[in-house]
Amino acid sequence: MRTFESEHYRFHYGAGTAAERDITEIAAMQESCFRHICAVLGTTPDFRIEYFLCDSPEEVGHIYGDDDPCNGFADIPDKIYAVYNDAVQCVGFHEDAHVVSYTLNRPESAAIREGLAMYFDRKWWSIENLDWTGFYLKTGRYIPVDRLLDDDFFFSRHCAVAYPIAGAFTDWLISAYGIEAYRAMYRQKSVPQAMAQVYGKSPAELNAAFEAYVRLFRTDGAVEARMEALLRQHEVEA
Protein backbone atom coordinates (compact mmCIF):
# COMPACT_ATOMS: atom_id res chain seq x y z
CA MET A 1 0.00 0.00 0.00
CA ARG A 2 1.05 3.60 -0.56
CA THR A 3 1.36 6.07 2.30
CA PHE A 4 0.75 9.77 2.88
CA GLU A 5 1.66 11.56 6.10
CA SER A 6 0.10 14.63 7.66
CA GLU A 7 0.71 16.18 11.07
CA HIS A 8 -1.31 13.63 13.07
CA TYR A 9 -1.97 10.83 10.55
CA ARG A 10 -0.24 8.27 8.38
CA PHE A 11 -2.65 7.21 5.62
CA HIS A 12 -2.38 3.85 3.83
CA TYR A 13 -4.19 3.23 0.53
CA GLY A 14 -3.96 1.31 -2.71
CA ALA A 15 -2.52 2.60 -5.97
CA GLY A 16 -5.09 3.81 -8.48
CA THR A 17 -7.89 4.03 -5.90
CA ALA A 18 -10.31 6.83 -5.10
CA ALA A 19 -8.40 7.30 -1.86
CA GLU A 20 -5.16 7.94 -3.75
CA ARG A 21 -6.94 10.43 -6.00
CA ASP A 22 -8.44 12.33 -3.05
CA ILE A 23 -5.73 11.83 -0.43
CA THR A 24 -4.83 15.50 0.08
CA GLU A 25 -8.49 16.41 0.63
CA ILE A 26 -8.99 13.41 2.94
CA ALA A 27 -5.94 14.35 5.00
CA ALA A 28 -7.06 17.97 5.31
CA MET A 29 -10.54 16.93 6.42
CA GLN A 30 -9.28 14.44 9.01
CA GLU A 31 -6.83 16.96 10.42
CA SER A 32 -9.70 19.44 10.82
CA CYS A 33 -11.85 16.80 12.51
CA PHE A 34 -8.93 15.85 14.77
CA ARG A 35 -8.32 19.44 15.87
CA HIS A 36 -11.99 19.96 16.70
CA ILE A 37 -12.29 16.71 18.68
CA CYS A 38 -9.15 17.51 20.66
CA ALA A 39 -10.32 21.07 21.35
CA VAL A 40 -13.69 19.89 22.66
CA LEU A 41 -12.32 17.03 24.79
CA GLY A 42 -9.23 18.87 25.99
CA THR A 43 -6.85 16.06 25.09
CA THR A 44 -4.44 15.31 22.26
CA PRO A 45 -3.00 11.85 21.55
CA ASP A 46 0.79 11.61 21.68
CA PHE A 47 0.89 9.29 18.67
CA ARG A 48 0.21 9.48 14.94
CA ILE A 49 -2.98 7.71 13.84
CA GLU A 50 -2.49 4.95 11.27
CA TYR A 51 -5.43 5.33 8.85
CA PHE A 52 -6.14 2.51 6.37
CA LEU A 53 -8.34 3.63 3.47
CA CYS A 54 -9.80 0.54 1.82
CA ASP A 55 -11.63 0.12 -1.47
CA SER A 56 -14.37 -2.15 -0.07
CA PRO A 57 -15.71 -3.67 3.17
CA GLU A 58 -14.07 -6.94 2.16
CA GLU A 59 -10.70 -5.22 1.87
CA VAL A 60 -11.15 -3.76 5.36
CA GLY A 61 -11.52 -7.27 6.76
CA HIS A 62 -8.63 -8.60 4.69
CA ILE A 63 -6.17 -5.86 5.67
CA TYR A 64 -7.20 -5.97 9.33
CA GLY A 65 -6.79 -9.73 9.25
CA ASP A 66 -10.11 -11.23 10.34
CA ASP A 67 -11.70 -11.24 6.84
CA ASP A 68 -14.93 -9.87 8.34
CA PRO A 69 -16.37 -7.23 5.94
CA CYS A 70 -16.88 -3.86 7.59
CA ASN A 71 -17.28 -0.24 6.47
CA GLY A 72 -15.10 1.15 9.21
CA PHE A 73 -13.88 0.78 12.78
CA ALA A 74 -11.23 1.98 15.21
CA ASP A 75 -8.60 -0.55 16.27
CA ILE A 76 -7.46 0.94 19.56
CA PRO A 77 -5.12 2.52 20.38
CA ASP A 78 -3.93 4.03 17.10
CA LYS A 79 -5.47 2.48 13.98
CA ILE A 80 -8.54 3.24 11.88
CA TYR A 81 -9.87 1.16 8.97
CA ALA A 82 -12.41 2.76 6.63
CA VAL A 83 -13.97 2.20 3.21
CA TYR A 84 -13.33 4.96 0.72
CA ASN A 85 -14.55 4.65 -2.87
CA ASP A 86 -16.73 6.63 -5.26
CA ALA A 87 -19.94 5.41 -3.61
CA VAL A 88 -18.96 5.13 0.07
CA GLN A 89 -16.69 7.45 2.07
CA CYS A 90 -16.50 6.36 5.70
CA VAL A 91 -14.28 9.21 6.78
CA GLY A 92 -14.96 12.17 9.05
CA PHE A 93 -15.37 12.44 12.80
CA HIS A 94 -16.67 9.10 14.04
CA GLU A 95 -13.74 6.69 14.32
CA ASP A 96 -11.31 9.51 15.10
CA ALA A 97 -13.53 10.50 18.04
CA HIS A 98 -13.15 6.98 19.41
CA VAL A 99 -9.36 7.07 19.11
CA VAL A 100 -9.04 10.49 20.74
CA SER A 101 -11.63 9.93 23.49
CA TYR A 102 -10.12 6.61 24.51
CA THR A 103 -7.00 8.49 25.60
CA LEU A 104 -9.25 9.79 28.39
CA ASN A 105 -11.01 6.51 29.18
CA ARG A 106 -13.13 3.77 27.68
CA PRO A 107 -16.43 3.72 29.63
CA GLU A 108 -18.19 0.38 30.00
CA SER A 109 -21.30 1.53 28.13
CA ALA A 110 -21.22 1.34 24.33
CA ALA A 111 -24.10 3.84 24.19
CA ILE A 112 -21.89 6.44 25.85
CA ARG A 113 -18.90 5.66 23.63
CA GLU A 114 -20.94 5.69 20.42
CA GLY A 115 -22.98 8.63 21.63
CA LEU A 116 -19.84 10.74 21.88
CA ALA A 117 -18.77 9.73 18.37
CA MET A 118 -22.27 10.57 17.10
CA TYR A 119 -22.14 13.90 18.94
CA PHE A 120 -19.23 14.83 16.69
CA ASP A 121 -20.87 13.31 13.59
CA ARG A 122 -24.05 15.36 14.22
CA LYS A 123 -25.99 13.47 11.54
CA TRP A 124 -27.19 10.01 10.48
CA TRP A 125 -27.91 9.63 6.76
CA SER A 126 -27.45 13.42 6.45
CA ILE A 127 -30.25 14.14 8.95
CA GLU A 128 -29.57 15.65 12.38
CA ASN A 129 -29.50 13.36 15.41
CA LEU A 130 -32.05 15.57 17.16
CA ASP A 131 -34.46 15.30 14.22
CA TRP A 132 -34.20 11.51 14.28
CA THR A 133 -34.78 11.42 18.03
CA GLY A 134 -37.84 13.66 17.83
CA PHE A 135 -39.20 11.55 14.98
CA TYR A 136 -38.71 8.36 16.98
CA LEU A 137 -40.53 9.90 19.95
CA LYS A 138 -43.39 11.00 17.70
CA THR A 139 -43.74 7.60 16.00
CA GLY A 140 -43.28 5.36 19.04
CA ARG A 141 -39.84 4.13 18.01
CA TYR A 142 -37.89 5.94 20.71
CA ILE A 143 -35.74 3.87 23.07
CA PRO A 144 -35.04 5.37 26.52
CA VAL A 145 -31.39 6.12 27.11
CA ASP A 146 -31.36 4.27 30.43
CA ARG A 147 -32.22 1.08 28.51
CA LEU A 148 -29.55 1.74 25.89
CA LEU A 149 -26.88 1.80 28.61
CA ASP A 150 -27.10 -2.00 28.69
CA ASP A 151 -24.69 -3.21 26.01
CA ASP A 152 -26.62 -6.34 25.08
CA PHE A 153 -29.76 -4.28 24.56
CA PHE A 154 -27.90 -1.49 22.75
CA PHE A 155 -26.39 -3.85 20.20
CA SER A 156 -29.72 -5.66 19.74
CA ARG A 157 -31.25 -2.44 18.36
CA HIS A 158 -30.70 -1.20 14.82
CA CYS A 159 -27.86 1.32 14.73
CA ALA A 160 -30.06 3.75 12.78
CA VAL A 161 -32.23 4.04 15.89
CA ALA A 162 -29.77 3.62 18.77
CA TYR A 163 -26.90 5.75 17.44
CA PRO A 164 -28.77 9.02 16.70
CA ILE A 165 -30.56 8.83 20.06
CA ALA A 166 -27.24 8.34 21.86
CA GLY A 167 -25.72 11.21 19.88
CA ALA A 168 -28.57 13.60 20.62
CA PHE A 169 -28.47 12.64 24.31
CA THR A 170 -24.73 13.37 24.43
CA ASP A 171 -25.30 16.74 22.78
CA TRP A 172 -27.96 17.56 25.38
CA LEU A 173 -25.75 16.46 28.29
CA ILE A 174 -22.87 18.64 27.12
CA SER A 175 -25.03 21.68 26.35
CA ALA A 176 -27.03 21.40 29.60
CA TYR A 177 -24.25 20.52 32.04
CA GLY A 178 -21.03 21.51 30.30
CA ILE A 179 -18.07 19.66 28.86
CA GLU A 180 -16.18 19.42 32.17
CA ALA A 181 -19.06 17.53 33.79
CA TYR A 182 -19.24 15.27 30.75
CA ARG A 183 -15.50 14.60 30.90
CA ALA A 184 -15.82 13.75 34.60
CA MET A 185 -18.54 11.21 33.78
CA TYR A 186 -16.64 9.81 30.79
CA ARG A 187 -13.54 9.18 32.88
CA GLN A 188 -15.40 6.66 35.05
CA LYS A 189 -16.10 3.02 34.21
CA SER A 190 -19.62 2.60 35.61
CA VAL A 191 -21.87 5.02 33.77
CA PRO A 192 -24.95 4.79 36.06
CA GLN A 193 -22.78 5.50 39.11
CA ALA A 194 -20.99 8.29 37.27
CA MET A 195 -24.28 9.92 36.27
CA ALA A 196 -25.51 9.88 39.85
CA GLN A 197 -22.22 11.28 41.11
CA VAL A 198 -21.66 13.95 38.45
CA TYR A 199 -25.22 14.97 37.54
CA GLY A 200 -27.05 14.03 40.73
CA LYS A 201 -29.63 12.08 38.73
CA SER A 202 -30.23 8.48 37.75
CA PRO A 203 -30.10 7.46 34.07
CA ALA A 204 -33.92 7.26 34.03
CA GLU A 205 -34.20 10.79 35.45
CA LEU A 206 -31.74 12.13 32.89
CA ASN A 207 -33.66 10.36 30.13
CA ALA A 208 -36.92 11.98 31.27
CA ALA A 209 -35.33 15.43 31.19
CA PHE A 210 -33.83 14.69 27.77
CA GLU A 211 -37.19 13.55 26.37
CA ALA A 212 -38.82 16.76 27.63
CA TYR A 213 -36.12 18.77 25.86
CA VAL A 214 -36.52 16.88 22.57
CA ARG A 215 -40.28 17.45 22.60
CA LEU A 216 -39.67 21.21 22.46
CA PHE A 217 -38.71 20.88 18.78
CA ARG A 218 -40.71 20.21 15.64
CA THR A 219 -39.43 18.61 12.44
CA ASP A 220 -40.47 19.63 8.93
CA GLY A 221 -42.91 17.22 7.31
CA ALA A 222 -40.68 16.74 4.27
CA VAL A 223 -37.80 15.70 6.54
CA GLU A 224 -40.07 13.25 8.38
CA ALA A 225 -41.17 11.75 5.06
CA ARG A 226 -37.52 11.36 4.09
CA MET A 227 -36.76 9.63 7.40
CA GLU A 228 -39.65 7.22 6.95
CA ALA A 229 -38.48 6.42 3.42
CA LEU A 230 -34.92 5.79 4.62
CA LEU A 231 -36.11 3.43 7.34
CA ARG A 232 -38.14 1.46 4.79
CA GLN A 233 -35.23 1.44 2.33
CA HIS A 234 -32.88 0.00 4.95
CA GLU A 235 -35.55 -2.27 6.46
CA VAL A 236 -35.13 -0.76 9.92
CA GLU A 237 -37.28 -1.94 12.79
CA ALA A 238 -37.00 -0.23 16.17
How should these model regions be labeled?
Residues 60, 65-73, 80-87, 103-237:
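Acidic/His/Gly-enriched intrinsically disordered linker/tail segments
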Residues 1-2, 236-238:
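Short, solvent-exposed mixed-charge patches
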Residues 1-109, 191-198:
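Juxtacatalytic substrate-recognition/specificity segment
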